[in-house]
Regions:
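Conserved S-adenosyl-L-methionine
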Residues: 224-355, 370, 374, 382, ...
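Short glycine-/polar-rich loops that comprise or flank the Walker A/P-loop
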Residues: 8-10, 34-38, 44-45, 294-296, ...
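A conserved structural/catalytic subdomain of Rossmann-like adenosyl-cofactor enzymes
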Residues: 68-74, 333, 339-572
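Long recognition/docking surfaces used for binding and targeting
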Residues: 120-121, 125-216
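Short amphipathic alpha-helical segments and their helix-coil junctions
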Residues: 92-112, 188-191
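Conserved phosphate/pyrophosphate-binding and hydrolysis machinery centered on Walker-type P-loop NTPases
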Residues: 114, 179, 199, 203, ...
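A short, conserved, highly charged catalytic patch centered on acidic carboxylates
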Residues: 1-38, 46-84
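Class I SAM-dependent transferase core
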Residues: 104, 205-230, 236-239
Length: 572
């Protein structure tokens, strides 16, 4: 109760509703009816704290005031990056960035008259910069938070932060780009985001949010969805990239395959130098060998401009300022010269494109062939290619009679295109619809693949992996191009087959999380985050006593054993 008004509630706690959206509405009604300035929602697993600013908006706060504190002390408190780590709503309250964005949409964005994707992207961009600066200067205070300013003062501060971020990471937003949210709407969004830590070891925090934003726009129309990070990690473990590998993702989405390849190689570099392993997606400064690898060896391409900007952001930050993510149509390479001559395109992408051109074979300059060691991709598999100018560039564009077809599945052309990106002995991991592996009509495709490379493995993914976007059954194909030294041609050889047994998501597309069998509570990783339950590779979680508990080896570990037994070149 309010100490100055003993009969008036000071804090109301809502315990009943299992979903935050339902419970928050109930909480609002109670607070509005009683005038209580603080509301708390919890379902026993998650908890959220709110300050009732007016009947229509409840501002998230970090906690309820202690007996010696006022509400204003909580609202106006200054925070360092270390303070943020302690109150992070994602690890402490088990919230997701996606759910917080949905909350912002309900509160203000739906009626703000702005492009939600662009405005949230700007805020995430500015907040990532703020976290980077404050992690590297432990005495600095975070600016991305409402510390008692007026709404207009707050907007001026956040716009300045965004402008500084644009200078640090060029080519994502134009110099003229401004935050378009009104001061009052921006204040709501800042309050919602200020107590979460975006820098996260596995990128899930940011990735999940961008997938949600883009799935509402054009992504689903072409059958292209961000690949879950646990599928990416399995592919990286099985393809085992090394510091000398040239790596590309030809349909990069948010660039998970390349970023996680970077993390894996960085671990190898640090282990070889006797340095602490470090984390993946952090603001920590990188040693020269790490940034040189990103600058010279890692590339990504996508046809969607928004997707490319997301991918470039994550690559720039993960790579400490380095990125070779390019906005191009991978399949339509005959038009690359025309596109790359455009001034605006050149300003952003020219440095990366010059490096890509150097990876063509000697004497080749039409972008049809490259010399990469590793291609990993999840190409769009909905919609056919119908342009004759594209189809005529591919052998798989012909039918069984050797004549060009009027339309060809997009993923089919990606198979051939990806193989043409590889040098002899190069390897590929590609996500494909299950039908390509067993449809009688696709026999010619399978024969084409077998003629050009050794089929290393096929891993069947669970039907729920790409839900809620699609329930299409998919598998990952792993191959290595024939080469006299790295992969001598054989007529008969063993192939590794495996099928994912744990679905990782339920039928609605919600992630299924690992449970600690000793406590019956959700298992957490060393960052206090929930762990998706799957069997693609070996999982571990932190026990109550602070020790790490390793679970059974998964598919990736079984393949590594197979690869060593077979003497595959990239596991020697």
């Amino acid at each position: 109760m309010d100490k100055d008004r003993p009969m008036v509630p000071y804090i109301i706690v809502e315990l009943k509703k299992p979903k935050l959206s339902d419970g928050k509405e109930q909480l609002k009604s109670y607070c509005n009816a009683t005038g209580a300035p603080i509301g708390v929602w919890t379902n026993g697993e998650q908890i959220s704290f709110y300050n009732r600013k007016d009947p229509n908006y409840f501002e998230p706060i970090t906690n309820i005031p202690k007996v010696s504190e006022k509400l204003s002390d909580i609202i106006n408190e200054k925070f360092t990056y270390e303070d943020l780590k302690k109150i992070d709503r994602i690890s402490q309250q088990k919230r997701s960035l996606r759910s917080l964005i949905q909350e912002m949409e309900d509160e203000v964005l739906a009626s703000a008259g702005v492009d939600s994707f662009e405005e949230i992207f700007k805020l995430i961009f500015a907040k990532l910069y703020d976290e980077l600066i404050c992690e590297r200067d432990s005495s600095a205070y975070l600016k991305f938070r409402n510390s008692g300013e007026t709404d207009f003062e707050l907007k001026e501060k956040i716009q300045g932060l965004f402008d500084d971020a644009k200078k640090k990471w060029e080519g994502i937003f134009t110099d003229e780009s401004k935050i378009l949210l009104s001061p009052s709407h921006l204040a709501v969004c800042v309050a919602t985001l200020q107590d979460i830590k975006l820098f996260n070891n596995n990128l899930d925090v940011v990735d999940d949010a961008f997938e949600y934003l883009m799935s509402k726009a054009q992504k689903g129309e072409k059958g292209q969805y961000f690949t879950p990070r646990y599928v990416i990690d399995m592919c990286v473990k099985m393809m085992n990239p090394s510091i000398n590998d040239k790596i590309i993702d030809t349909a990069c989405g948010s660039s998970g395959f390349t970023v996680h390849s970077i993390f894996k190689v960085w671990k190898d570099i640090r282990r070889e130098k006797g340095l602490p392993e470090g984390e993946g997606f952090t603001a920590a400064q990188r040693i020269p060998e790490e940034t040189n690898f990103v600058r010279d060896n890692v590339f990504a391409i996508d046809f969607d401009e928004k997707t490319v900007r997301v991918a470039r952001t994550l690559n720039l930050i993960a790579g400490d300022g380095q990125t070779n993510v390019l906005h191009l149509n991978t399949l339509d390479f005959s038009r690359w010269n025309e596109i790359t001559k455009q001034e605006d395109w050149n300003d952003t992408y020219n440095e990366g494109f010059k490096k890509l051109k150097k990876l063509q074979p000697k004497g080749s300059n039409d972008y049809s062939q490259f010399q990469f060691d590793l291609v990993m991709a999840n190409p769009p598999f909905a919609g056919d290619i119908k342009e004759n100018t594209i189809i005529s560039r591919y052998e798989l564009g012909k039918n069984s009679a050797g004549k060009w077809q009027n339309k060809v599945g997009r993923d089919i052309l990606f198979i051939e295109r990806n193989l043409n990106f590889l040098k002899p002995g190069g390897r590929m991991a590609i996500v494909l619809p299950q039908g390509r592996f067993n449809n009688s009509s696709d026999k010619a495709i399978r024969e084409y693949i077998a003629g050009r490379c050794r089929i290393l493995a096929v891993v069947g993914l669970h039907r729920n992996v790409f839900k809620p976007h699609t329930g299409t059954k998919t598998s990952v194909l792993f191959v290595q191009k024939w080469d006299d030294e790295l992969c001598p041609k054989k007529e008969d050889y063993p192939i590794f087959f495996a099928t994912m047994q744990k679905p990782s998501k339920d039928n609605s597309g919600d992630k299924i999380y690992l449970v600690d069998p000793e406590t019956g509570l959700p298992a957490l990783d060393k960052h206090n985050h929930l762990i998706v339950d799957h069997d693609l590779f070996q999982l571990s979680y932190m026990k109550q006593d602070g020790t790490e508990n390793l679970l059974e080896p998964g598919i990736a570990e079984a393949f590594a054993e197979f690869a060593n037994k077979e003497g595959l070149s990239f596991f020697r």
